[in-house]
């Protein structure tokens, strides 16, 4: 299972330098039977990005993209974990993404993000990360 944060999901709707490599990487992962997920937070954030920056028709494309993902709920235990997970410098919404991904830790093969602070937090808690196309 691949967890995608909003920085990754956005690249699938709004063309950015990493978009092509991300799509290629996801196609390869899908060919190996990998499913993808995000959290309820990722869903809300993506729809807000589309509302702010999207072109006509992107709301429908965003909903189609989200329909193909497992949407992980933000339960009370997830919120409780978000209060303490990762480094103290981790931003609140990033901590929620980490805690949401922790729900699928056993199945998690990669946490896809392009956010440097979130990448650091992922590594601190032991998640394998991927940022296809990013220059590090």
Curated annotation (Swiss-Prot):
What is the top EC class of this enzyme, as a single word? hydrolase
Q: Where does Mg(2+) bind?
A: 5, 94
User: Which cofactors, if any, are listed as required?
Assistant: Mg(2+)
Lineage top rank: taxon: Bacteria
Any idea where the PINc domain is? 2-104
Please give the CDD domains that the UniProt record associates with this protein: PIN_MT3492-like
Gene3D superfamilies in the record: 5'-nuclease (3.40.50.1010)
Magnesium as UniProt keyword: yes
UniProt entry keywords in alphabetical sequence: Hydrolase, Magnesium, Metal-binding, Nuclease, Toxin-antitoxin system
Task: Give the EC number.
Answer: 3.1.-.-
* GO molecular function per UniProt: magnesium ion binding; RNA nuclease activity
State the family named in the UniProt similarity comment for this chain.
Belongs to the PINc/VapC protein family.
| Physiological role | Toxic component of a type II toxin-antitoxin (TA) system. An RNase. Its toxic effect on colony formation is neutralized by coexpression with cognate antitoxin VapB47.
Record protein name field: Ribonuclease VapC47
User: Which organism was this protein described from?
Assistant: Mycobacterium tuberculosis (strain CDC 1551 / Oshkosh)
> Gene name on record?
vapC47
């Amino acid at each position: 299972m691949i967890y995608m944060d909003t920085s990754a999901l956005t690249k699938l709707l709004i063309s950015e330098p990493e978009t092509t490599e991300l799509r290629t990487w996801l196609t390869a992962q899908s060919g190996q039977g990998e499913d993808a997920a995000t959290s309820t937070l990722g869903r809300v954030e993506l729809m807000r990005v589309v509302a702010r920056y999207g072109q006509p028709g992107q709301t429908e494309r965003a909903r189609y993209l989200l329909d193909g993902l497992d949407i992980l709920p933000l339960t009370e235990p997830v919120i409780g974990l978000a209060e303490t997970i990762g480094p103290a410098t981790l931003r609140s919404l990033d901590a929620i993404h980490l805690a949401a991904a922790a729900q699928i830790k056993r199945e998690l093969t990669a946490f896809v993000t392009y956010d440097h602070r979130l990448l650091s937090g992922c590594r601190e808690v032991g998640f394998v990360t991927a940022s296809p196309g990013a220059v590090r």
